[in-house]
C-alpha cells in the first residue's frame, strides 16, 4: 500500500508544470517565407508583389535578395485604397504602361491602412502616399525615398520622373 501511494505521489508530481492552469502557451515567433511570391517572376517590366503577413524587415530582406538574384531593383511601395494617385500608378503598372521606363523594377506592395502598424516597426512611416522607398540592407526604411503625388490624370506623369531619379541612386 505504501509503495502504491509513493508511485501515485511521484507520478502526480511529474505532471506539474510551472505554468498556472489554463495559461496560454508563449507566442511562437513566426519567420517569413524564404520566398516572396511575385518577386523576380517577371522577365522584364514593373512587377507588383503583395507583401505577405509577417515581420516587414525580414520580408523586405528576403524580397530584396530575390530581386537582386534576378538582376532587378526592389523598392518598398506603400499605397492606400483611397489614394487616387496610388490607384492610377498601380493601374498603369499592372497594364505594362511603365515597363519600358522601368524594365527591372520590383515593387513590394503594402497597404497603409492594413499594414501601417507593422510598417512603423521597420521605420516605414510615410507622411504621404504613394510611397516608394529604397530599403536598407537590414530591410528597414532609409532616407532614400519619395512620397506623394498630384491627383488627377497627371499623377503618373508626376510620379515617373521622380521615381526615375530615386532609382538612379538605388543600389
For every predicted segment, state its role:
Residues 54-72:
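A short beta-strand-turn-helix
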Residues 14-18:
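Bacterial signal peptide processing site
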Residues 1-13:
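Sec-dependent bacterial lipoprotein signal peptides
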Residues 70-81:
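Short active-site neighborhood of thiol/selenol oxidoreductases, capturing the structured segment around
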Residues 54, 80, 99-117:
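Thiol-based oxidoreductase modules, predominantly thioredoxin-like and allied folds used
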Residues 127-171:
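Non-catalytic, surface beta->alpha helical segment in thiol-disulfide oxidoreductase systems
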Amino acid at each position: 500500500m505504501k509503495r502504491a501511494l509513493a508511485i501515485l505521489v511521484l507520478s502526480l508530481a511529474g505532471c506539474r508544470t510551472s505554468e498556472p492552469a489554463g495559461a496560454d502557451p508563449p507566442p511562437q515567433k513566426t519567420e517569413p517565407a524564404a520566398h516572396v511570391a511575385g518577386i523576380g517572376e517577371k522577365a522584364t517590366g514593373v512587377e507588383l508583389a503583395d507583401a505577405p503577413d509577417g515581420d516587414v524587415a525580414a520580408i523586405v530582406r528576403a524580397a530584396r535578395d530575390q530581386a537582386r538574384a534576378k538582376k532587378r531593383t526592389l523598392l518598398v511601395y506603400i499605397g492606400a485604397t483611397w489614394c487616387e494617385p496610388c490607384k492610377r500608378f498601380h493601374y498603369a503598372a499592372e497594364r505594362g504602361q511603365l515597363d519600358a521606363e522601368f524594365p527591372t523594377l520590383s515593387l513590394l506592395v503594402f497597404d497603409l491602412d492594413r499594414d501601417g502598424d507593422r510598417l512603423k516597426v521597420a521605420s516605414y512611416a510615410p507622411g504621404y502616399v504613394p510611397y516608394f522607398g529604397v530599403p536598407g540592407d537590414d530591410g528597414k526604411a532609409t532616407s532614400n525615398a519619395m512620397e506623394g503625388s498630384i491627383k488627377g490624370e497627371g499623377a503618373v506623369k508626376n510620379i515617373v520622373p521622380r521615381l526615375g531619379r530615386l532609382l538612379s541612386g538605388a543600389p
